A protein has these predicted regions:
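C-terminal catalytic histidine-bearing segment of alpha/beta-hydrolase fold enzymes
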Residues: 221, 225-228, 235-298
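Active-site machinery of serine-nucleophile hydrolases
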Residues: 72-128
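The feature captures the conserved acid-bearing segment of alpha/beta-hydrolase catalytic domains
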Residues: 183-249
Length: 386
């Protein structure tokens, strides 16, 4: 069983403590506990849900999952970046899952390293099994998840994310590897891992970020560049990846800016402006291109399509009014359980003077959301005017 405990982060003049009983808590997530049979221990993870998740009108929505390693360090800022970027339509809304550490050297190192003193490195594959065979199934049971998953890791976490990307099979679709610690991967080890890479890795997207390590900078950059270029050569088509170097960031300061750049690279062109779209065909081709690059079917976001439709519905050009209906109908095809999609179709038919079709679609909206007073009032007023 998982135990849910509220995680409340209070931001009051930069102070994380409650100064008054009247202060309202700003809750950004919940704590969960999962008893792992694979790891033989209890593992804590934190969850941040999208803003629309608890909206009854959006109960049909399912969300991609972002799994964050070293979650105690990265949870707050990543949740904030995801919330902001999805709010302006640059990326999809997603569920953020941050894993709290128990023994990161054990969990994040794929290979056993031989040292003078005994160590417990080399548990990376076991930890990936925990993520894929226990954590993800639990998330699927408890939340409305879509089977598109991103793995974020920094330092040793970046090493594990890279290792997961290079495996024959994985449940993750994209990877953000921030300044990965490749110190245990000498040339021989790296070549061995590259030899084992199959075409399946190139059906995924990976982002690498490199920090400025000062005197050790050349060595660090060379390791990242060597792996990136070797993967690029091995990929027969266009390599779905990006490598970025941050001259002004060190190993400790790079994660926030690299996460922003990485998630932007994954969802490049996702945030197309509603003002730049003229036809449904243009929009569908745009998202087909994104889907092809990411090997996953990303539909045009409902909110984006709705905004395009209403822009055209309010246009003085009569042709735009008919085109608005096409966009609204597209939403009903992609999101058949959306009350708002049918409500918008009703609005378009109303402007076009087809009361029968308008009432028909408002009724569909009301069936999907019986609490929709807007649809109820529209039906009532249209029936009166007949």
């Amino acid at each position: 069983m998982s135990k849910s405990i509220i995680v409340a982060f209070i931001f009051l003049f930069g102070i994380n403590q409650v100064k008054s009983q009247n202060v309202e808590h700003i809750v950004i997530g919940t704590k969960q506990l999962l008893h792992s049979k694979i790891l033989s221990e209890a593992r804590e993870y934190w969850i941040h849900l999208p803003e629309s998740y608890h909206n009854s009108a959006a109960s049909y929505k399912k969300y991609p999952v972002l799994v964050v390693l070293d979650g105690n360090t990265h949870f707050k800022y990543i949740s904030g970046i995801v919330s902001y970027m999805s709010g302006i339509g640059k990326i999809p809304e997603m569920i953020v899952v941050s894993i709290q550490n128990v023994d990161r050297r054990r969990d994040f190192t794929p290979d056993k390293t031989i040292t003078v003193r005994a160590n417990n490195s080399g548990g990376g594959d076991k930890f990936i099994s925990f993520l894929e065979d226990e954590l993800i199934p639990e998330l699927n049971r408890k939340y409305r998840t879509a089977p598109y998953r991103i793995l974020f890791g920094h330092s040793l976490g970046g090493l594990l994310a890279t290792h997961a990307y290079m495996k024959e099979k994985t449940l993750f679709n994209s990877f953000i590897s921030v300044d990965p610690s490749f110190g245990t991967w000498d040339a021989k080890t790296m070549d061995k891992k590259l030899d084992a890479v199959t075409v399946h890795s190139f059906e995924r997207f990976i982002y690498f970020a490199t920090a400025n390590w000062g005197k050790r900078n050349i060595r660090n950059r060379d390791r990242h560049l060597r792996l990136y270029e070797a993967l690029n050569r091995k990929c027969e088509g266009e390599f779905p990846a990006k490598l970025a170097y941050f001259e002004n960031e060190n190993h400790g300061s790079i994660p926030p800016i690299a996460f922003y750049d990485g998630i932007s690279a994954i969802f490049k062109d996702y945030g197309i402006s509603f003002r730049d779209v003229d036809t449904t065909m243009q929009l569908m081709k745009h998202f087909q291109s994104i889907s092809q690059r990411l090997s996953w079917n990303f539909k045009p976001p409902e909110l984006l399509v709705n905004r395009i439709g209403y822009r055209m519905l309010r246009s003085r050009n009569e042709n735009d009014t008919s085109k608005a209906l096409e966009f609204f109908i597209l939403n009903t095809e992609n999101f058949p359980n959306s009350c708002n999609a049918y409500d918008s179709v009703g609005a378009a038919y109303e402007v076009l003077g087809n009361k029968k079709k308008a009432i028909e679609n408002y009724k569909k909206a009301l069936v999907l959301n019986p609490k929709s007073e807007h649809a109820r009032m529209k039906i009532k007023n249209l029936n009166k005017s007949e």
